[in-house]
Amino acid sequence: MRLPVSLFLLLGFTPIGVFAQSGPAPVIAAARERQPFKIVLVGDSTVATEGGWGPGFCATLTPNVRCVDLALNGRSTKSFIDEGAWQKALAERGQYYFIQFGHNDQKPNPKVHADAATSFQANLRRMVSDVRAQEGIPILVSSLSRRNYVDGRPDPNDGLADYAAAARQVATEERVTFLDLYGLSTKYLAGLTQEQADGFDMAGHADAKAENGSAAKPDRTHLNEAGKTLFGRMVADNVVRLQVELGPNVVGVAAGSGAAFPK
């Protein structure tokens, strides 16, 4: 599927952050000088290696960066903490933590549900505090959009907008860098048709089978290799506009530009 480059360029200049934090000086200096450092990704299946943007993002980084994708299928902020996955992530002692949840927090299952206005925000604040306590830099990322269309546009009633707004609110109040992937991906998908967007669908993801009861239905949540590459690049090319010291560590992107997308 050929993608309209003009949309990428437009997105590259879209304001997406509410606050660009500075962070601990040694961490910033290491990134600017391309010394070895670690980025840890935490989140749900839309970040995870099997069907998320994480691998595509990690592939954009220079060899001095160790990118560790610890996102887990089916997890929410609540279950990620409750099951001990968050403590394992902290044990990595990363310099940067990219944190994206929402897809499972919105589900009614009490094992994963976290209310957008209350517990979801409390869980994000805990994660931000924990990362800062060990002198790391947290970056909050809103959820990747689903690819279900209504009347030729991405479905505005997917329930993720409330969680994106909640993440933005936490970022503003905690003075944390916020990357609005939900807004970016929704805007990009608005320029495609359902048929074109289905070109990113993954076949056979375990979460999709569990939810749909069959692997035959389209999986418009998880990503195939093309989707991983595209949306991973979207994250990389835009986060360097907010954490500008990361620019030298992303292949093909001038520091702070956020304008280079695959053609």
Please place each PLM-identified region on the residue numbering:
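Bacterial N-terminal signal peptides
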Residues: 4-17
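Short, charged N-terminal helix-start/capping segments
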Residues: 15, 32, 38, 157-166
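Serine-esterase "nucleophile elbow" of acetyl-processing enzymes
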Residues: 20-74, 79, 84-93, 97, ...
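Alpha-helical cap/lid subdomain in secreted, periplasmic
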Residues: 83-252, 258-263
